Amino acid sequence: MTELHLEARHLVMIEQMLQEFIPEARVWCFGSRVHGRGLKRFSDLDLVVRDEEDLHAKLGKLRDAFEASDLPIKVDLLEWNQLPDWLKQEIFEEYVVLQEPAKAAI
């Protein structure tokens, strides 16, 4: 598994917000926080939501939560279905699964 270049306490905050707002979604991290090239202390965190369901309203609330949080970095939250093919290919080359969809209780 590829290491995620992020402080553990920040990762916990991000995972908690993902679970609160979009527990049903698969979320991948990509970019400099994954591969480490060009990484700076305050580099943003690139996340992509890989879900066929329309989560636009929930993602807006999640974006607001990220902005209002105590995270010292910016979180860019993208939707897979809106990405160009070249960026999808770039993400496929190196990513970290941050969240898998929550399973419904049986």
Give, region by region, the residue ranges found by the protein language model.
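Catalytic core of pol beta-like nucleotidyltransferases
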Residues: 1-26, 34-41, 50-106
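Short, well-ordered beta-strand segments
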Residues: 46-48
